[in-house]
């Protein structure tokens, strides 16, 4: 058999087993662990003089109805919390991922994976020098402006989870869409937005009927927030309804400790599955020791991106954020004290360390309500890099690569939010049968600016050049909506997630919804142990005077970095 050098192979088909890829300008390196394409020398590749031609890599007679792929991503490097770091062809058909492996024509090629047959129905994305990830899920979104969708897609986020009705004071502070009428209007509004949505109802009610009517109107879960009273009684009532109707509950706890301390809130959870927002506390929650929640096996902890990674300016910007988001007045001393109680440098630094240890399982944005919706993937990779520089290699990493660390942070913005919300069987990873929400990145821009964003197997968002140019690449290049963002294709490639109660009561027909409507499921059995690569249960102590955080008896701290990767090199502002 003819042999070529590793360099020549990489030039032709991209990296393979043992090759390493640097992620942007960071110090993170991933190494390909497995090549799922079976054998070398029979690669499928699109282009002039390449192999994806009729009678070669393209099967002559197979129809789409009989199983021919709609789209193949060839020779791509997959970075996925479930799959690991692997080389593969990825096949898509009818908006779903068919599988990973070797694609092509089994009549002329050896080792073609079952189901990954290419033919006249198949289009191609050349993935040889690209990285493929699952579309990200932002689990903490205030629906303040519909233009958030554009910013989210521009950083590889394909699913939003939160609540609100626009730029009203309640939505500026709380991620809930309150009551049946507001839920109906929001479900109607998002019909034209090319991204998946889950809407949280207002969980702040000790009465049961107002909670149930929200689920039947299309809420996909609940949020309990301190601005509406996160009392133990409210939490218990909301969790009881959630248990009966199989939906998730997110909670923003009581910063002022008026109705109890963190131990009282944990007791109110009563061992039931609950998602704690911004578990560090700068975004809100029991001061100063909310971090104790990350050591509970029934609690699914997340935190938000404004403090990730903790840089030299992180603390300084938080005060004004809190004052604006929670309708506080800087002329009122008690309002100022409320804001100041949430800003603790020691716990903010510990937040990054706990993420690196896998103790905090998810990252959300807290969009326009302290966080930045277009930076969730970005902040995850920046934090991974900052922690490598501050703490060194993780014990789980193999010598010479950062695979485990990178996959840990990828899980925080993909599969773990999906599992928590009850949609992990549909999105969150690159697995057979899942919705083809996928993101392609050039390695130099990984985590910062995607090349293509696919929704339901069709390109929805892309970095596109001048439409009047002779090529797709001439300037000005910026993100533009693509065909999956237009017409009725939008409704076929984007999902609205609702409760099973709403789904069974025909919410789509009642409200005239044209998007794909799917019910959440399995939320009440999810615990910390299910958080992929992020299931660590430490013992947390917070000094009430200095706010120093000890994790299993060891002070959890690092020096804030003076500079951060994937930052000014990539942005004009």
Swiss-Prot record:
Gene3D superfamilies: Metal-dependent hydrolases, Urease, subunit C, domain 1. GO terms for molecular function: nickel cation binding; urease activity. The modification N6-carboxylysine is found at residue 223. This is Urease subunit alpha 2. It comes from Brucella melitensis biotype 1 (strain ATCC 23456 / CCUG 17765 / NCTC 10094 / 16M). Ni(2+) 1 binds at residues 140, 142, 223, 366. Substrate binds at residue 225. Heterotrimer of UreA (gamma), UreB (beta) and UreC (alpha) subunits. Three heterotrimers associate to form the active enzyme. The gene is ureC2.
């Amino acid at each position: 058999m003819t042999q070529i050098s590793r360099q020549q192979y990489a030039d032709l088909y991209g990296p393979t087993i043992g090759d390493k890829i640097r992620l942007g300008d960071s110090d993170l390196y991933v190494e390909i662990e497995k090549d799922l394409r079976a054998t070398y020398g029979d690669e499928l590749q699109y282009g002039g003089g390449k192999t994806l031609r009729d009678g070669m890599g393209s099967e002559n007679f197979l129809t789409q109805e009989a199983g021919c792929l709609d789209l193949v991503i060839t020779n791509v490097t997959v970075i996925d919390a479930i799959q690991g770091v692997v080389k593969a062809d990825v096949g898509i058909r009818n908006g779903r991922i068919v599988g990973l492996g070797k694609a092509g024509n089994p009549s002329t090629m050896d080792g073609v994976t079952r189901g990954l047959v290419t033919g006249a129905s198949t289009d191609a994305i050349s993935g040889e020098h690209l990285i493929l990830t699952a579309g990200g899920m932002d689990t903490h979104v205030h629906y303040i402006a519909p233009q958030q969708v554009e910013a989210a897609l521009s950083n590889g986020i394909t699913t939003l989870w939160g609540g609100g009705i626009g730029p009203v004071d309640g939505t500026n502070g709380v991620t809930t869409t309150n009551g049946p009428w507001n839920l109906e209007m929001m479900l109607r509004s998002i019909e034209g937005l090319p991204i998946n949505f889950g809407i949280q109802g207002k969980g702040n009610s000790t009465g049961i009927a107002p909670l149930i009517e929200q689920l039947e109107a299309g809420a996909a879960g609940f949020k309990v927030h301190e601005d509406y009273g996160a009392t133990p009684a409210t939490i218990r009532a909301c969790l009881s309804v959630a248990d009966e109707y199989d939906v998730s509950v997110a909670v923003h706890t009581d910063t002022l400790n008026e109705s109890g301390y963190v131990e009282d809130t944990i007791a109110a959870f009563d061992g039931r599955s609950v998602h704690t927002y911004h578990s560090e506390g700068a975004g809100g929650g029991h001061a100063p020791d909310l971090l104790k929640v990350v050591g509970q096996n029934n609690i699914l902890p997340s935190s938000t991106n404004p403090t990730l990674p903790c840089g030299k300016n992180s603390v300084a910007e938080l005060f004004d954020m809190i004052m604006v988001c929670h309708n506080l007045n800087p002329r009122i001393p008690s309002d100022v004290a409320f804001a100041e109680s949430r800003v603790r440098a020691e716990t903010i630094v510990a937040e990054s360390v706990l993420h690196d240890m896998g103790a905090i399982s998810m990252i959300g944005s807290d969009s326009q309500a302290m966080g930045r919706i277009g930076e969730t993937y970005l902040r995850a990779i920046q934090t991974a890099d900052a922690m490598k520089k501050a703490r060194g290699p993780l014990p789980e990493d193999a010598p010479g690569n950062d695979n485990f660390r990178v996959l840990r942070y990828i899980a925080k913005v993909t599969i773990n939010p999906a599992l928590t919300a009850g949609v992990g069987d549909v999105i969150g990873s690159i697995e057979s049968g899942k919705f083809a929400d996928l993101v392609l990145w050039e390695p130099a821009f990984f985590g910062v600016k995607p090349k293509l964003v696919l929704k339901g197997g069709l390109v929805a968002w892309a970095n596109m050049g001048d439409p009047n140019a002779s090529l797709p690449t001439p300037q000005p290049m910026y993100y533009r909506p693509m065909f999956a963002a237009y017409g009725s294709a939008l409704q076929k490639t984007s999902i609205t997630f609702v409760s099973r109660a709403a789904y069974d009561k025909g919410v789509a027909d009642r409200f005239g919804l044209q998007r794909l409507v799917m019910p959440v499921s399995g939320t009440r059995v999810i615990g910390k142990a299910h958080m992929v690569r992020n299931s660590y249960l430490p013992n947390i102590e917070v000094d009430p005077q200095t706010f120093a955080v000890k994790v299993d008896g060891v002070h959890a701290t690092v020096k804030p970095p003076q500079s951060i990767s994937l930052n000014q090199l990539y942005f004009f502002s």
